Structure formats: C-alpha cells, structure tokens
C-alpha cells in the first residue's frame, strides 16, 4: 500500500521514471497508430482557422470536425497522462512557442514542429530534473513550469494587450 501511494504521488508530480518496458511497447504501438491519424486532421484544422462560415462554405461539417479534433487531442493526451502523469505546461507552451518560432498558423508545419519540440523539451526538462548533484530527482513538472509559465503568461498578456488596443 505504501509503495502504491508513493507511485501515485510520483505519477501526480509527472515522471518518466516509472514507465516499464512492457508499458513502453504498448505506448509506442498506440502512438504509432494514433499520431498518423491525427495528421489526417491537418486540413480540417486549417479550414477551421478560417472561421465557421468560410469552413462551412467550403464543405466542412463544423460539429463533426470539432468532435474529431477534440476526441483526437483528448485520447492522445489521456494516453500520455496515463503513462507519465500530468506534465503541466508542455501541452500549453509548446504550440505557442512553435507558432512564434515558425510564425505561422499552418498546421502542416505546426503539427510536426510541436511533436518534435514537445519531445525535445520533455527530454531536456527530464535531464535537468535528474541533474547530478541533487538528492534524488525533482519532479519533471517543476522544470516544465519554469519553461512553460513564462510562455503562457506572455500569451495571456499579449492577448490582453490586443484586447485593450481594440
């Protein structure tokens, strides 16, 4: 029971350390199937950027498209969270960072960029959390918060500034 509580607390703080080889095999299989399926939604998401009326005029079923995008994002997020815990700020900060770096809203560019940038940032944060010299390891969330919080704050302040200027 004590080990289960410890495992739950570590999972709740976000950790890659408790994922076993068998779990990783299942994770890779699921991601190998689901990520390419999410790439099939790129055109749909680009159409949704145009607004509902334009997208509808171009033949997009808005309700169905939203359901597919939300379901796809939800399932992928749920799988990652089930394995690694809620690693906060990666999912919020990385898309905004990529949008700022590549200066585009085109999902043909953003989807692969976010995929690779998110993986790279997760690995870097995990390495920093396990830096030699620490007693044990910091939760990955403590490092992702240092990166993600300023990004999310800048997005919120920029949006607020734009609203005030209008």
Please annotate each region the language model reported:
Residues 1-166:
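Alpha-helical transmembrane segments in inner-membrane proteins
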